[in-house]
Structures are given as structure tokens and as C-alpha cells.
Design a protein with these regions (language model features):
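N-terminal export signals
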Residues: 2-4, 10-31
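C-terminal trimerization/auto-chaperone modules of long, extracellular attachment fibers and adhesins
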Residues: 27-43, 363-432
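Acidic Gly/Asp/Thr-rich repetitive segments characteristic of extracellular carbohydrate-active
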Residues: 51-82
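N-terminal extracellular ligand-recognition/capping segment immediately after the signal peptide
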Residues: 73-101, 105-117, 134-140
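All-beta strand scaffolds that present successive hydrophobic residues in beta-strands
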Residues: 83, 101-105, 129-133, 154-157, ...
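Extracellular beta-strand/beta-solenoid scaffold signature
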Residues: 113-122, 138-148, 168-182, 194-206, ...
């Protein structure tokens, strides 16, 4: 951009500013020439109860616990609680009724801080409580930011939850928890949220809750599925799990430690963990279903560790490395995960993921091959418009050994690999043909041929 272009823009901005100042000057009182613009009292919920109207200071020094309690005390009435920009130091958070809404001005400007070992926000048997545009910072080594038990359809939108776990202070804060979902809590949604620096970011022992367009950073364990009662599950979409390279910061981004329910991951990014995903336990069990689609996985040691899972499914997953040395992209225990599906997995650490990584019971489709344990029902190969083979059997060098032609005829390309028949006494014979076209047989013995 030329200086002339910049000057023209500056002139335009100056002209617009002067034009905008005219009506303001006309409205100003002549006896208050120093009056500056003052932001009106604005919120998207005009009926909200502003905590500063009930004595909250919001300077990060004063204890605002009692003021928040007064603001939230509405009896049987509906509650919309508003925390304007500020830093509110508390030791407890008030109880909230069903359908309450708690609003701030932004996750980094309306900040609630708590330095005690407590569960700060605790909801039990409540419905559709909403939190939006708030920040919560916990510094108690065994504290929990949010706990929901037997709650339904609660939501967190643009909320920042932050603990105190760092590599430098490990393991002091590994007991800190960001969110705990327990009981029969369901339908909880975390949208555009940040959950950072906890011992465990999210602990869930219940099914059917959702994390969307959010980020979990530098938690020792990002998400823990626990309970071992076939119940824990979670759906994550457009989520980032990130951390640094220090092994004390993050050990797992997702860990499922026993018998659980459905886990669904779509468009999820993982980087900066020893083992990015550790799924199941050989002695305790694992998910009834685990699915990953369109994900990127990087790790220091193992990308995806499938230890126990009834029905794992991975599609369009790319594996990468965090350090200079390549990790194990995917590790599958043949006892705990004998069956599963893997489609279009690629790796930047190798030319391709070897089919031998997966147990024989898996269906694996890669960019140039397919493995499946069996086909059920009638298998159909249909001839195309040309005379191309319907089927080919190739050797490791990709040379054709046998084929089914477009006409349906069988073709063997090797004289020593003709049709093998078994007689009524259990002996095997190979059909042969002489250069003159005379048919014959060659005995192969009673042991089933393998080559």
C-alpha cells in the first residue's frame, strides 16, 4: 500500500470522525464541556439482576460471595444473573433455580476466581440452566469448577474454565477438575468453551452430553470417561486438544478407563500428549461403541491406543508426530478389540499404516487395498463395458496369477497353479494341460495345498 493510499484513508477517517462529532456536540450541555462518552447500561437480558447492584465490587480483592448470593436470591421467580466486566473473588457460588441464566461480558473480562478446595458451581436435579460469556479460575489444588448431577439440558456458551495445573508445579494440581458430569446428567452442551490447566478437564460417568467448537488445553487428562458401569459417553465435534511437549503437562487427551457407552468424535484435533487417546481396560472393559471421523492425531508415544472396545470405527484419520521421532500411530489389542473398522487412515510417519496393525477380524480399507474377514450373502462381480477382468488374483509383485474374465471364464496364468480337486478318499489332485491340449492330473497328497 502506498503512502498516498494511507493518507487518503486517514483523511477519510478524520472527515467521518468530524461528521460524527457534530450531533454529539449539539447534544452536549454547554455547562459540561468536559463530559466524556459513557457506555449505557446494556445487556441482552434487560431484566437481569446486576451483581454490582447488590454490593459486588469486582476488583479481585474484595470477597463478593455474599453479594452474588443476594443477587441470586429470587425465591420462586425466574433468575437472570448478570456479572459485568470485573474480577469477582468468591469462596462459593449461590444455588440456582431451574431455567436460570448467568451472563457475563466475556470469558476473559467477567471472571470469577476461587482459591479454596471446593466445588464452586454445583447443580443437582436441575433443568436448562445456562451460563454464557463467563470465566472461572480455580486455584485450590483439589477444587472442581462445575459439577452437574442428574441435570438435563444445561448449557455453557463461550465460558472459560481454568485451573492451575502446569508442568512446573506437577503433580500439585492433578486432582483439580474442570467439569464433572455424573448421575443421569444428559443433554449438557459446551459450545465455544475453553477448559484449560486442570488435572482432568472433563470427568463423565454418564451418557449423551456434547462438546462443540471448544478447546481443551494443557490438562493432565483432557477427558476421562469413568464409572465402569456401561454408562459413560460423550460426543465431541470440532474440538481441539492441545498441550506442550513436556511429559508432565499432559498424559492423555481422552481416557476411557472401563466399561462405558457410546463415544463419538468428529473433526477433532489432538496434539501434545504421551498417549493421545487411551480407550478401555482389559480387566474392566471399554466403550460399547467408539467412533472417530475426520480427526488429526499427534502424540509422543502412541496416537490411538485401543485396549478394549466392542465396536471401534475410524475413518479419515491422519496420524502425525509431536517430537522428532515417530510415535506408534495406532495400537490395537487383539483380545480387547478383535473386530472393528478402519477406513482411509493415513500417516505422515510412514508410507502407509500396515494392515498387520489390525487384528484379522477387522475390516480395513486403505487407499490401495481392502481387508475384510468375510463376505456374507451372494458376492457379485459385474463385468463392465470393456473386456477388463471381473476379478484378478495378484502376487506380491502385483503380477496376475489368475483371473475371471469378462465372459465369466476362469483363467490361470501359471501352469503349476491349475484347478485343484479333492477325490472321495481325501486326496488332492491338480489339473494339468500339455502343450498339445491334453488334460491330465498331478497328485498332491492328502494334505490341503497352501501354495
Amino acid at each position: 500500500m502506498t503512502d498516498d493510499g494511507v493518507d487518503r484513508r486517514r483523511m477519510l477517517v478524520t472527515a467521518l470522525g468530524a461528521a460524527a462529532a457534530l450531533p454529539l456536540a449539539a447534544c452536549a450541555s454547554s455547562d459540561s464541556p468536559g463530559l466524556e462518552f459513557r457506555s449505557p447500561h446494556v445487556t441482552d437480558a434487560p431484566s437481569a439482576r446486576n451483581v454490582k447492584d447488590f454490593g459486588a465490587i469486582g476488583d479481585g480483592v474484595a470477597d463478593d460471595t455474599a453479594a452474588l448470593a443476594r443477587a441470586a436470591d429470587v425465591g420462586d421467580a425466574s433468575l437472570v444473573l448478570y456479572l459485568p466486566a470485573g474480577k469477582y473473588r468468591v469462596t462459593a457460588f449461590p444455588a440456582l433455580p431451574d431455567y436460570a441464566t448467568v451472563l457475563g461480558d466475556g470469558g476473559d473480562v467477567s471472571l470469577i476466581t476461587c482459591d479454596t478446595d471446593t466445588i464452586l458451581i454445583e447443580l443437582r436435579k436441575q433443568n436448562r440452566v445456562r451460563f454464557s460469556r463467563l470465566g472461572i479460575f480455580m486455584s485450590g489444588p483439589a477444587s472442581t469448577a462445575v459439577l452437574l448431577s442428574n441435570c438435563f439440558r444445561c448449557s455453557f456458551d463461550a465460558v472459560v474454565l481454568r485451573g492451575n495445573h502446569l508442568s512446573d508445579n506437577h503433580p500439585k494440581f492433578v486432582q483439580q477438575r474442570g467439569v464433572v458430569l455424573e448421575g443421569d446428567t444428559g443433554g449438557t452442551a459446551f459450545i465455544n468453551c475453553d477448559i484449560n490447566n486442570f488435572g482432568t478437564g472433563i470427568v463423565t460417568s454418564c451418557i449423551q452430553n456434547y462438546v462443540t467448537s471448544s478447546k481443551l488445553t494443557s490438562n493432565y487428562v483432557g477427558v476421562l470417561g469413568t464409572g465402569n458401569d456401561h454408562n459413560a459417553g460423550l460426543a465431541l465435534t470440532n474440538v481441539e486438544f492441545v498441550s506442550d511437549r513436556d511429559p508432565r503437562t499432559t498424559v492423555n487427551h481422552i481416557r476411557v478407563d472401563g466399561a462405558s457407552n457410546d463415544w463419538w468424535l468428529t473433526n477433532v484435533w489432538f496434539e501434545g500428549a504421551e498417549i493421545a487417546l487411551s480407550i478401555g481396560d482389559l480387566k474392566r472393559g471399554g466403550p460399547s461403541q467408539f467412533g472417530m471421523s475426520n480427526c488429526k492425531v499427534a502424540a509422543r508415544d502412541v496416537g490411538v491406543d485401543l485396549i478394549y472396545c466392542r465396536q471401534p470405527y475410524l475413518a479419515n484419520v491422519i496420524f502425525d508426530k509431536d517430537l522428532d521421532r515417530a510415535p506408534t500411530d495406532i495400537r490395537v489389542d487383539p483380545t480387547g478389540c478383535p473386530e472393528g473398522t478402519a477406513i482411509n487412515l493415513i500417516s505422515t510417519n510412514a508410507d502407509d499404516i500396515r494392515p498387520g496393525v489390525f487384528p484379522d477380524g477387522w475390516t480395513v480399507i486403505s487407499r490401495d487395498s481392502m481387508h475384510t474377514p468375510y463376505f456374507a450373502g451372494t458376492m457379485v462381480g459385474r463385468a463392465g463395458a470393456s473386456d477388463a477382468d471381473i476379478f484378478q488374483a495378484q502376487g506380491p509383485d502385483r503380477a496376475v496369477r489368475a483371473a475371471i474374465l469378462a465372459s465369466g471364464a476362469w483363467l490361470s496364468e501359471r501352469p503349476e497353479a491349475g484347478v485343484v480337486l479333492k477325490d472321495t478318499t481325501g486326496g488332492y489332485w491338480r489339473l494339468t494341460v500339455s502343450p498339445e491340449g491334453a488334460l491330465g492330473t498331478a497328485p498332491l497328497g492328502r494334505q490341503r495345498p497352501r501354495g
